């Protein structure tokens, strides 16, 4: 789990997301509170529950981007889901319980990777010995039995040196590695998930312990053997328990598009993917126990962050019980032309930086002047005002139009230096800057 302070988390988010200080502060405090809670002693630790967050704001202002960046910072089990993908229990479609199952699978991968890294040094040594055994098969005695290998022979040490220096990387060898598990996906009828999990485990156990001969280059064989040896050093039952603990204590669920499951108007028919889904979400958010193939998972201390544009519906259209379980509300503001200017230049891997790097692969040096950045931002802002406001995503459309000619001709422009200034932008985006013909920029 991340031990970053709220100020450090906000600073990290600032490198990728412009503005939205309130939203950044809210998620930073929530993430830090996860760490604070773990410093408490029982039984007080059990009593401290997470304060779930509802982020409200128009499309394209950074709600989903905050979730993406948070996933990298959290160093904890994290899953982002779309609320519209789920249906009420009893109908065809995904049930909300699958969120926790997917989160547990994510935790298994995270914990497994951590354990592999812990054992990597030992696994590398064992993999190296296996490669050397293949290159220098141990001798057999007069009865055909393999003699105990001597790891310190001169020949073996010479080969070990060559192996570590990469001199043998392109040589092909045949090795025995564990056969991959049979991946079987079974769609379970409602209420029969436990049987499905047992069937999946049965199919996976069919291939466990089996090995497969594969021919590959030594550099690829080493990677495969390191993973193979590291997997042998991991206790599967201990891994499951660590993953379940990680989900229960540090898990974070980000539910996007929650406004799309709000009930609109007085509609009395079956509400399979709206109010029914909200009611199914209630026990998860409040705290319940979900059966997964790795074991039972309690959701009492999982942090839920929901977000939605709420352009048609309002937060008050959510059922009251769910509103009460999302106590922290953060409003994200619409982006201005000044924000667009900052988005084009300030974040790590900004749009202008991306296009410069792409054109550099063709030997073309691109330079954006301040006036060009200002004109691009104004053009994107104007299109958003006159048509559908899709926030920062509009910049992608405008930039593609601006760079269209250069991108097409770049392969014949090697060695050239192109300066994109205000006049160039006006010429390329003239139909939006002067004539306000916006049809080219509507997605």
Swiss-Prot record:
Q: What assembly does the database describe for this protein? A: A double ring-shaped homohexamer of HslV is capped on each side by a ring-shaped HslU homohexamer. The assembly of the HslU/HslV complex is dependent on binding of ATP.
Where along the sequence do coiled-coil regions lie? Answer: none
* Keyword terms: ATP-binding, Chaperone, Cytoplasm, Nucleotide-binding
Q: Which CDD domains match?
A: RecA-like_HslU
| One GO process term, biological-process aspect | proteolysis involved in protein catabolic process
Return the NCBIfam families for the record: hslU (TIGR00390), PRK05201.1 (NF003544)
The entry's ATP-binding residues are: 18, 60-65, 256, 321, 393
- Where does this protein reside within or beyond the cell? Cytoplasm
What InterPro entries does this protein's entry cite? AAA+_ATPase (IPR003593), ATP-dep_Clp_protease_ClpX (IPR050052), ATPase_AAA_core (IPR003959), Clp_ATPase_C (IPR019489), HslU (IPR004491), P-loop_NTPase (IPR027417)
What this protein is reported to do is described as: ATPase subunit of a proteasome-like degradation complex; this subunit has chaperone activity. The binding of ATP and its subsequent hydrolysis by HslU are essential for unfolding of protein substrates subsequently hydrolyzed by HslV. HslU recognizes the N-terminal part of its protein substrates and unfolds these before they are guided to HslV for hydrolysis.
What HAMAP family has UniProt attached to this entry? HslU
Question: Nucleotide-binding: present as a keyword of the record?
Answer: yes
Q: Could you identify this protein by its name?
A: ATP-dependent protease ATPase subunit HslU
Q: Which Pfam families match?
A: AAA (PF00004), AAA_2 (PF07724), ClpB_D2-small (PF10431)
The record's comment on protein family reads: Belongs to the ClpX chaperone family. HslU subfamily.
* Major subcellular site: cytoplasm
**A GO MF term:** peptidase activity
Q: Which GO terms describe its cellular component?
A: HslUV protease complex
Q: Note whether ATP-binding occurs among the keywords.
A: yes
């Amino acid at each position: 789990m991340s031990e970053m302070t709220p100020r450090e988390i906000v600073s990290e988010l600032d490198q990728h997301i412009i503005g939205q200080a309130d939203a950044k502060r809210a998620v930073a405090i929530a993430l830090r509170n996860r760490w604070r809670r773990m410093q408490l002693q029982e039984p007080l630790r059990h009593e401290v529950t997470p304060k779930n967050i509802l982020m409200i704001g128009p499309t394209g202002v950074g709600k989903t981007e905050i979730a993406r960046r948070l996933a990298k910072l959290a160093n904890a089990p994290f899953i982002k889901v779309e609320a519209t993908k789920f249906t009420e229990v009893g109908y065809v479609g995904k049930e909300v319980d699958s969120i926790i199952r997917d989160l547990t699978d994510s935790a298994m991968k995270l914990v497994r990777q951590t354990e592999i890294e812990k054992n990597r040094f030992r696994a590398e040594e064992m993999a190296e010995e296996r490669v050397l055994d293949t290159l220098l098969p141990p001798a057999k005695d007069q009865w055909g039995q393999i003699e105990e290998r001597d790891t310190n022979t001169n020949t073996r040490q010479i080969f070990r040196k060559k192996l570590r220096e990469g001199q043998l990387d392109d040589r092909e060898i045949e090795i025995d590695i564990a056969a991959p598990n049979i991946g079987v996906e079974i769609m379970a009828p409602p209420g029969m998930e436990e049987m499905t999990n047992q069937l999946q485990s049965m199919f996976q156990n069919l291939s466990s312990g089996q090995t497969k001969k594969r021919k590959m280059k030594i550099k690829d064989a080493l990677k495969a053997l390191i993973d193979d040896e590291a997997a042998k050093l991991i206790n599967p039952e201990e891994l499951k328990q660590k993953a379940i603990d990680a989900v229960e204590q540090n898990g974070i669920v980000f539910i996007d598009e929650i406004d799309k499951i709000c009930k609109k108007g007085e509609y009395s028919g079956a509400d399979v993917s709206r109010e029914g889904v909200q009611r199914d979400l209630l026990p998860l958010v409040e705290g319940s126990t979900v059966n997964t193939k790795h074991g039972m998972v309690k959701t009492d201390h999982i942090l839920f962050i929901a977000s939605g544009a709420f352009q048609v519906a309002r937060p008050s259209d959510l059922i009251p019980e769910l509103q009460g379980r999302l106590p922290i509300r953060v409003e994200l503001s619409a982006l201005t032309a000044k924000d667009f200017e900052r988005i084009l230049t300030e974040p790590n891997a900004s749009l202008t930086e991306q296009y410069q790097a792409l054109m550099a692969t063709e030997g073309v040096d691109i330079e954006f002047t301040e006036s060009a950045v200002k004109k691009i931002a104004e053009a994107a802002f104007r299109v958003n005002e006159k048509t559908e406001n899709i926030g920062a995503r509009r910049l992608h459309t405008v930039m593609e139009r601006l760079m269209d000619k250069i991108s097409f001709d770049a392969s014949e422009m090697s060695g050239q230096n192109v300066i994109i200034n205000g006049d160039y932008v006006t010429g390329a985006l003239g139909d939006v800057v002067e004539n306000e013909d916006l049809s080219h920029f509507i997605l």
